[in-house]
Regions:
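Membrane-interfacial amphipathic helices and adjacent loop/beta segments
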Residues: 33-40
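Active-site-adjacent pocket-lining segments in enzyme domains
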Residues: 7, 17-30, 47-177
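Short gly/ser/thr-rich secondary-structure transition/capping motifs
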Residues: 40-48
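Short, contiguous strand/loop micro-motifs
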Residues: 1, 37, 68-69
Length: 177
């Protein structure tokens, strides 16, 4: 899901690695506009708008973080979708400040989770994991800390969806050793 002022690296790096793994990946705008401006002022063209997208067979809902994470609260459809995904045990991923959305929705209760330093207290009900860990998966939810861990998050999602072997191949081919 793309919101205004989400950090550019999170969405681009995670989407890039998922697409390299041939995982169908759609960037969905929650702003009502197909063109979404990142926190760094980069315009990203979404694939579709949330109110037009049909969620059928999607394996993952990913929330990039950054200063725009608060705008997720303004999108009631997204919040309901997150609750529905969690109820069905569908995979949800979030990075930086975005895991706080999951915490505030009660989706992290009893689960290990992490967020950008300073946002841990908003991971309501979570077992908070900190450095040196870079990404943590507990059940259907995967969280990560920030820009420097976005490739780790992408590779973890590839591992979960397509397996360890492909994740390692991508790690090597991207020189992330």
């Amino acid at each position: 899901a793309l919101s205004s002022a989400a950090s550019d690296v999170y969405k681009r790096q995670v989407v890039d690695i998922l697409r390299r793994a041939d995982i169908k990946t759609d960037m969905i705008s929650i702003t009502g506009d197909i063109n979404v401006k990142s926190a760094q002022g980069v315009i990203v063209q979404a694939d579709e708008l949330l109110d037009e997208y049909v969620f059928e067979g999607d394996e993952l809902l990913f929330l990039p973080g950054g200063p725009g994470h608060k705008s997720y609260y303004d999108c009631k459809d997204l919040l309901e979708l997150l609750k529905e995904y969690n109820k069905k045990n569908n995979r949800i991923a979030a990075i930086c400040a975005a895991p706080s959305i999951l915490g505030n929705l009660g989706l992290l209760e009893g689960k290990k989770a992490m967020a950008f330093p300073g946002f841990e207290m908003q991971l309501t009900g979570a077992v908070i994991i900190t450095a040196p860990e870079r990404v943590v998966t507990d059940g259907n939810i995967t969280t990560s800390r920030g820009m420097g861990t976005s490739l780790d998050l992408g590779l973890e999602l590839v591992r979960l969806i397509k397996g360890e072997e492909l994740a390692e191949q991508l790690r090597t081919s991207t020189q992330y050793i």
